[in-house]
UniProtKB/Swiss-Prot annotation:
Pfam families attached to this UniProt entry: Herpes_UL42 (PF02282)
Source organism phylogeny: Viruses, Duplodnaviria, Heunggongvirae, Peploviricota, Herviviricetes
The protein's name: DNA polymerase processivity factor
Origin species: Varicella-zoster virus (strain Dumas) (HHV-3)
Subunit and interaction comment: Interacts with the DNA polymerase catalytic subunit. Interacts with the origin-binding protein.
Major subcellular location class: host cell
Gene3D superfamilies: 3.70.10.10
Family: Belongs to the herpesviridae DNA polymerase processivity factor family.
């Protein structure tokens, strides 16, 4: 349908003409907000076509399974340009009997059909409510380059009357933050090697290992209960300070040595490979260790539409943990020694850096600053501030229990 020269109010009246049921709730996304959501959700659209949408007074959650694992994308109510809600939560399937889906509105396209506005209208009474989704976009008209035609598409769905759903609301015991370059290393690792994924954390390092012996390692600076970071082995090689700092990850929680093995590698691999980070986005790897029989690893992407995913795991036995840790530490130390410059050159580099940055003699220690001691030399290098670790900001959407069950 084409609509020419319509004001917002006139357009709204015409869009909802024919749906005479009284409106009980409403949600609106305009172009500026919608553009950010499309850039965040579009890479996952093909995985989300059969997803479930949950509306409540706290906003919208998009929930789907990814290779048998659970994935959640919360969009809080304050992100909508208009959001009015009354009544209990409403659950609808995104898929329709045809080729359309409620998720199509979040797909990025190269043609002008990318939506500029998105409306959700809710009618009826539970458990027989309906949702009317209206997607509005513009296309070039036939009267010249300045002629723009407003088009719209509507999808109508009924709510699910019976459903069971899980919303994890645990607080992670340990949360590790990865920047974009560090997350790219994880993607390359999972793309190159196959079938199993193992996480090992010590007091100073985090190792991620896959089948075939491939692994990546990071130096960990952990913020415990808001205190200063615990000491870590910052300097493995001083030939390139930028490379050293790129190997440092920051996190929070109660650190202890442990290892977990994911029960399904394919789900974690698919989630990581389908996510792309911008320079302003970060990824948090969360570890849930309170349940000793069923630990979980969580993946949280901090963006306009944050992505939460959870993967069941099992603890490594003390014997396996020791064997894996010994082999990876040995290989990491061999690489460190190979890259280390001669001692005389190393001292010259340290002296120049110390004089330039601090104006103190070698070995000077500035008070009230986060400093870390190098290997075998009395030199201190300043570390970046700790980035507070993310938590499940919208994990309490299920306030009654972890499992929601409504029966008609």
């Amino acid at each position: 349908m084409d609509l020419r020269s319509r004001t917002d109010d006139a357009l709204d009246m015409e869009l909802h003409a024919g749906f005479d049921a009284p409106e009980i709730a409403r949600a609106v996304l305009t172009e500026k907000t919608l553009t950010g959501l499309i850039s965040s959700i579009s890479p996952l659209v093909n995985r989300l076509r059969d997803s479930i949408l949950i509306f409540s007074d706290e906003g919208l959650i998009i929930h789907c399974s990814l290779e048998t694992e659970q994935l959640y994308i919360p969009i809080p109510a304050n992100m909508f340009d208009q959001y009015n809600w009354t009544g209990p939560r409403m659950v609808v399937l995104a898929a329709t009997e045809g080729r359309s889906s409620l998720i199509d509105a979040f797909r990025h396209t190269k043609d002008p059909s990318t939506p500029t506005r998105l409306y959700f209208k809710f009618t009826g009474q539970p458990p027989e409510r309906s949702i009317i989704q209206t997607m509005v976009w513009q296309r070039p008209g036939d009267c010249g380059p300045d002629d723009q035609v407003q088009c719209y598409k509507q999808v109508v769905k009924r709510e699910l009357a019976c459903y069971t759903m899980m919303f994890p609301n645990l607080t992670p015991d340990i949360s590790i933050c990865l920047k974009r370059d560090q997350f790219t290393r994880l993607q390359r690792l999972l793309k190159t090697f196959g079938f199993t994924t193992c996480f090992i954390l010590t007091a100073t390092d985090m190792y991620i290992q896959t089948a075939g012996g491939g692994f990546i390692s990071f130096n960990v600076s952990l913020d415990i209960n808001g205190s200063k970071p615990t000491p870590y082995n910052l300097i493995r090689s001083i030939t390139n300070s930028k490379r050293i700092l790129n190997n440092v990850v920051y996190g929070s929680g109660s650190m202890r040595e442990f290892g977990v093995l994911l029960e399904t590698h394919s789900g974690f691999r698919s989630a990581v490979q389908n996510l792309k980070l911008t320079r302003d986005e970060t990824c948090y790897i969360n570890f849930y260790l309170a349940l000793t029989n069923s630990p979980m690893v969580g993946l949280y992407i901090q963006r306009s539409a944050p992505v939460h995913s959870f993967f069941y795991a099992t603890f490594l036995s003390p014997k396996d943990l020791k064997e894996k840790l010994t082999s990876m530490q040995l290989f990491a130390n061999m690489e460190s020694v190979k890259d280390e410059p001669p001692l005389k050159k190393r001292r010259n580099l340290l002296t120049k850096r110390n004089e330039k940055n601090t104006g103190n003699k070698m070995g000077g220690k500035l008070p009230e600053t986060t400093w870390q001691e190098g290997i075998g030399i009395r030199e201190y290098c300043v570390a970046p501030p700790v980035d507070p670790a993310g938590t499940l900001d919208y994990s309490e959407l299920s306030r009654e229990s972890d499992v929601i069950c409504t029966v008609k």
